[in-house]
Amino acid sequence: MRNKLKEIAKDTNIFLQKFITKQKKTELIPAMKYGLFPGGKKIRSKILLDIGSIFKIKYQTLIAIGAAVECIHAYSLIHDDLPCMDNDTLRRGKPSTHIKFGEATAVLAGNSLLTMAFEILSSSYLRISEKSKLSLIKRLSECSGHLGIAGGQYLDLNFEKKKSFKK
C-alpha cells in the first residue's frame, strides 16, 4: 500500500511538474510550486485512483484528474494559512507560502492553482469526452466554491468568531 501511494504521488508530481513547465513563466510560478510541492502523500489522488480503477478508467487519465484535485487542495491550504484566515506560519514544517513570498503573492498563487486545476481538466492531456470534462469541471467547481471548500472555510471563520465572543 505504501509503495503504491508513493508511486501515485510520484506520478502525480511528475504530471504537475510537466504541466507547470509548459506554462508561460511568471513570477507567481515559484510560489505556486512552493505551495504545490511541499511533500504530502497525495492521498486524494490515491483515493481517486482506487475508485477510478473500479470503473476501468485509464491510469494516466486518473493521474491527470488527481493532479487537478491536488491543485485545489494546495490552493485551499495556501489560503487557509493566510493571516485573515487561520494565520498559520508553518505548513508541513516549512514557512507558509505567505510567510515566504508575502501575503498578496500567496493569494495570487492560490488563485492560480485553483484555475490551473480547471486548465488541467479542460486540456488535451485529459483524453476523455468533452461531456465528461464538463461534468468534472462542474463537480470540482461545486466542491471548491461556496458549497464546498470556500463555504466550509466561511463556517470555520464564523465558528471561531462566535467562540471568541463568548470568552
Language-model regions, residue ranges each:
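Mg2+-dependent prenyl diphosphate-binding active-site environment of isoprenoid biosynthetic enzymes
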Residues: K10, Q17-K167
